[in-house]
């Protein structure tokens, strides 16, 4: 079964980006056609991505891969959700305008820090941590642990704006920002999460489906723990696609990885 077989059954679609539409280098076969079919049916697709970057930066990347902006109604990134949460005061005074925050991410990556109302500083003088990306494999989890021990001892709050545990890279699967956040928790640090499977990003995505019952929205992703679990908690119908992080994994393994079983298992889009 593929996503295109289910378009007539639902009123809206929430679709993951990495591992579902593309692999970071090229769009998957059938991905563009599926978005075109949703649009032709007069229905809306919202792309929901655990990415510390802005929605605009993700849209630009998709365009470079041939996925045109007109093919989806909106894109919501976890980084964008974090910014909106800061504006609403959701994360407390440490992330209020002007807060001294140390940013964790990939070396040389542009996370558009000017969109956050914060003051980026060195780790030693930070009042909070903002985890936007991972520098793995250049920096190992053991090295992150050593770096973050003093921050945990100081009881600094960390905001993880990408809860993914694994990421697809040219060198294979590597620890993602969520894995760094877990390391910080094991050190005794406190972490707030924004992104799938947590509620805020789904609340933002739901704004594009005013008047649509949650069960009439099909959420499609490749991560049992993030895409399926988060969408199920939001009340959406769920579909796990066997690409990306789920490629090559048998059904029993996928079931063990998911607190909530998906409503549908898809071979592709």
Where in this protein do the model-derived segments appear?
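Asp-based, Mg2+/Mn2+-dependent phosphohydrolase catalytic module
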Residues: 1-17, 22-41, 51-269
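N-terminal phosphate-binding loop and flanking beta/alpha elements of the actin-like ATPase fold
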Residues: 44
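Glycine-rich loop-to-alpha-helix module at the N-terminal edge of alpha/beta enzyme cores
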Residues: 48
